[in-house]
Amino acid sequence: ADDANQMIYDILSQDRVKRIIKTKSSTIEEIGLIPYLEMKKIKVTETNIGDFICQLYNQVPYNIVHSADNKTNSQIADLYSDKFGIKQNCNPKQLTLYTKQLLKEEMSNPSAVITGANFLVSNSGTIVLTENEGNILKSCSFAPIHIVVASINKLITSIDELSVLLPLSSFYEPNRNISSLYTFINGPVEIEGQLQKLYLILLNNNITEILEKEIQRDILSC
């Protein structure tokens, strides 16, 4: 984790990046990247709505999928009134639209984006990202620097395996059989005439050590 954080900071430093956007990723949370970058004076903005609300509260996500489910509409309305000066009697739809507009501005001109990855296809070099809000696709499309942080257990052999794994990855998300959007990345894109800088950081974080243990290896099936 420490090596990954240092590597990411070095990448951002060589381009003098001081402001980045981030998408939802449990791996990024695992290595403590955001507090590390903020300690280095790099501003990080969450682009997932729930994670953005948690960031405003200066709290970690309540749930891996629904980050701010522990907050009521009135609590969020009070928060937005304090932070942005909007009226306190906003309904959930108004709050969502206001948040989307804030994040749209952040995603339209980022210096860099950091994402996780749902799957890494080894035989084609494809990075697969799943989402429901559209923030990942927007972020990756505009950022001149894209850093992907993924653990080695995201590696799969063939893209054919996704026919099973993509529906399965949404199995535990309430009221949704499959994710709304998929992004398949096979290399850097061209942004305003320049080729995007794309980095993939593979994280071991003791996974290979756990795999060697007959009983403990089962936790990696979660």
Residue spans of the language-model regions?
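The feature marks the mature, well-folded catalytic cores of soluble enzymes
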Residues: 1-219
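Short cysteine clusters
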Residues: 222
